[in-house]
Amino acid sequence: MMETNALTYSVLSKRRNDLFGISIVSIVIFHYCLLSKLAAAKVYIALVGSVGVPIFLILSGMGLFFSMSRNPSLKDFYKKRLVRVLIPYAIVSVVHFLVRYVIIEGKGFVAFLKGVFFVEFFTQGDSQFWFIALVLIMYVFFPLLFKLFKSGKYNFLKLCILLAVVVACNFLLMKAVPKFYGNIEVMLTRIPSFIIGVYIGEKVYNKRPVQWPYWVIALIGGGAFIYFALMRNVAGVKPPTSLLIRYGETLYALLLMMVLSIVLEAVNSKGLSKVCAFFGGMSLELYMVHVSLRSIMGLIGFPASNALYYAIMVALAIGICFGLQKFDNFATKKLTAKPKKVAK
């Protein structure tokens, strides 16, 4: 097979923190554009969309493959990962649902608990923290995905079969239980991104060369996403199914990740990398905090569609995340530290 010069998948690992930073910034901008009536917002949605989400999930799957390759202990894996996610989620979700459900909307303590434990998401479609629900579910299945792709043999065939099953399940749920599917569609349609991330993780870990099929698939998927997104958001023509945009966006993410990594390598700007890494380091916290604040500010008379309000909210979210990240890192180290052996 033809190789794209000497380019290997390891470039994604080298620029992983930068890509995390770019992904979360693009998500924050996307969430503003969803509410804005500006023409530029529609163009952004069509050309960029929520591509930061599949980038984030692909990078997460890739990172988990590295982590388990270096330390195959399931106990250590779950301890570290769950602590890393659950500590910030517990803090943000408790405050969010207490303020929103109990204080502002007066729904009571039961609704508060349902919100924190994702019951409202699955039953009512309250999708504020759907991303965390997906991450936790993917953690459960990750060891199986790791074993599936670890050997490197027939991995592309395995990937195709697995993705076909996932897509088929999406269609079946859509037809069988449309209301329930509507509640969790945003989560279900992102599962392929994580699976692809684990698949790519094996290639990154073993520094495999990037071959031409990668570019063909990514270009076709990216082109399909932009076409259908432009038709929907600019021309007002709905695609046959929203899944075309969701899955096309996943392939578009593959294209952007590789292109951005190559550009970042060529530019090699320490300043730019520091900025990207700054946001990348707090990407999980920033995702949770900004969607929480965005939701609450609308309920108290400060619509997030207002650019000034949104900018203030983002600045506040970054400040909160800075402190939250420090606490999270401290707690994670304390809770995951191995006990020191006492000399006999």
Where are these regions (language model features)?
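Membrane-interface helix caps and helix-loop-helix hairpins in membrane proteins
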Residues: 38-44, 121-129, 173-185, 234-244, ...
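Transmembrane alpha-helix boundary/anchor motif
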Residues: 59, 140, 195, 199, ...
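Alpha-helical transmembrane segments and terminal signal-anchor/GPI-anchor hydrophobic tails
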Residues: 184-193, 202-285, 289-297, 303-313
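Juxtamembrane membrane-interface segments at transmembrane alpha-helix termini
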Residues: 55-56, 170-176, 206-209, 227-231, ...
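Short glycine/serine- and small hydrophobic-enriched flexible loop segments
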Residues: 62-66, 146, 198, 202, ...
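Membrane-cytosol interface segments of multi-pass membrane proteins
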Residues: 1-168, 270-272, 279-282, 302-344
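Loop-centered beta-sheet repeat module
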Residues: 158-203
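C-terminal ends of transmembrane alpha-helices
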Residues: 29-37, 166-180, 224-237, 292-294
